[in-house]
Amino acid sequence: MGLFSGKRPDGLGFHTDSKAGGNMAGAFKPCSWKPNCVNSTADQTADAAHYIRPFNVSGDAAKAWATAVALVKAVPRVSVVTESATYLYAQYRSKLMGYVDDVELALDASAKVIHVRSASRLGVRDFGANRARVERLRAKLAAAPAS
């Protein structure tokens, strides 16, 4: 993949039971201590540095999910690795150096939210890149016409 792509992390996925990767029910892999990750399933109080709000879903959850997936796929240098009716794992590659960030979305239709996790593979700091990526996606999703 390239010198700056790093290794795909273990434990990715939206874990729906406590046995899966040691995570709590309905959660992504926790962020490490590094400030280069955001996660909507992080504890808002205990892990405020990594916490980011999930995307609210109004209307039909399946349509909102399809819109979110289409928005991710429309971003340049994105490779979708895994896609299902409720989970998406994509790799974002930076333009200049080819750094790879791992981005996950998970639809929780009953809670009317789409959970999100975005993390850099390499380095310690991301200068807010993962948080900015999620907020851009949030803005595009909010601006998308209801289907």
Kindly give the residue locations of the regions a language model identified.
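Ser/Thr-rich, low-complexity intrinsically disordered terminal regions
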Residues: 1-147
